[in-house]
């Protein structure tokens, strides 16, 4: 099997412990600026006046809409964060959702939210590595990777593991950031740490990955135009809540966040796209 060059981590790519450290450090930032959901918002045409929390829920609802699953069946959420999308999925479809994250702090927060919302019968969040899934083959009826797969050292391994635990014909729905123009090493040094990105691939790269891992791509939706306002909302939040951020972060780190974010916006606008991909396990 040929491994795609875009799936080979760079020598200094983040490890699992680095991803956990990132969320330990940035968790308070996202909580303050983004709220309870650790993912972007989606403002489709005609709904540009939504608040950030409303846009985040709209994106989650789109993921739910694109994921066929029946009541009582089992879904896997790879990189589930603090668990709110998993809870919303379980509530909407009355299915069991099993979420994994490499951040112990997110596990604790997710489990507390599950208890508070009385969803413990349907939603189960634990620590786990998406490249070494602790589940039997052919167990799940659907899977997600919602703004998480770019953290992982190998998309190929993640897709191989997802294919192993999914039943034939089951859907795998993911969101990812893909390159449309190659980032320079200097741009990577700015953009990758901002989101703890391990590697980026391309739209064609996904077709190649699916061909190698037993999936067929059914749909690729470019959501970039509706996602970009997340960056503007984040920049505004940093400005409006600077005092609260200054109480959390030392001056050096806060200064780095303020300096980096405008550069991240420029790179995002020209070099990458945000996509939602619907794939299905062959067979």
From Swiss-Prot:
Catalytic activity field: (+)-kolavelool + S-adenosyl-L-methionine = (+)-O-methylkolavelool + S-adenosyl-L-homocysteine + H(+)
Role of this protein: Involved in the biosynthesis of the diterpene (+)-O-methylkolavelool. Catalyzes the transfer of a methyl group from S-adenosyl-L-methionine to the hydroxy group of (+)-kolavelool, forming (+)-O-methylkolavelool.
Residues reported to bind S-adenosyl-L-methionine: 106, 129-130, 151
S-S pairs: none
InterPro entries: Erg6_SMT_methyltransf, SAM-dependent_MTases_sf
Keyword terms of this UniProt record: Methyltransferase, S-adenosyl-L-methionine, Transferase
Organismal lineage: Bacteria, Bacillati, Chloroflexota, Chloroflexia, Herpetosiphonales
MF GO annotations: methyltransferase activity
Pfam families assigned to the protein according to its UniProt record, in alphabetical order: CMAS (PF02353)
E.C. code: 2.1.1.347
Domain of life: Bacteria
Protein name (Swiss-Prot/TrEMBL): (+)-O-methylkolavelool synthase
Family to which the UniProt record says this protein belongs: Belongs to the methyltransferase superfamily.
CDD domains assigned to the protein according to its UniProt record, in alphabetical order: AdoMet_MTases
Protein's UniProt keywords contain S-adenosyl-L-methionine: yes
GO biological process: methylation
């Amino acid at each position: 099997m040929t491994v795609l060059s875009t799936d080979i981590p760079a020598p200094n790519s983040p490890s699992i412990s680095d991803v956990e450290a990132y969320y330990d450090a940035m968790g308070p930032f996202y909580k303050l600026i983004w709220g309870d959901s650790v993912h972007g918002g989606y403002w489709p045409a005609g709904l540009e006046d939504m608040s950030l929390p409303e846009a985040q829920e709209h994106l989650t609802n789109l993921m739910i809409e694109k994921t066929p699953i029946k009541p009582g069946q089992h879904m896997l959420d790879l990189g589930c964060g603090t668990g709110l999308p998993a809870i919303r999925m379980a509530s909407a479809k009355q299915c069991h959702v099993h979420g994994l994250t490499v951040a112990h702090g997110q596990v604790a927060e997710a489990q507390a939210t599950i208890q508070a919302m009385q969803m413990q019968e349907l939603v189960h969040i634990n620590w786990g590595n998406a490249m070494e899934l602790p589940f039997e083959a052919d167990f799940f009826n659907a899977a997600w990777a919602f703004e998480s797969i770019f953290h992982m050292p190998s998309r190929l391994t993640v897709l191989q593991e997802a294919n192993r635990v999914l039943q034939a014909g089951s859907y795998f729905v993911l969101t990812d950031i893909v390159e449309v123009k190659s980032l320079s090493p200097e741009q990577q040094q700015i953009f990758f740490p901002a989101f703890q990105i391990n590697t980026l691939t391309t739209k064609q790269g996904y077709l190649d990955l699916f061909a190698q891992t037993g999936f067929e791509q059914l749909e690729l939706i470019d959501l970039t135009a509706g996602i970009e306002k997340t960056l503007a909302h984040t920049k505004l939040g940093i400005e409006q809540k600077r005092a609260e951020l200054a109480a959390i972060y030392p001056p050096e780190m806060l200064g780095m966040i303020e300096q980096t974010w405008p550069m991240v916006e420029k790179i995002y606008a020209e070099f990458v796209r945000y996509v939602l991909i619907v794939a299905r396990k062959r067979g």
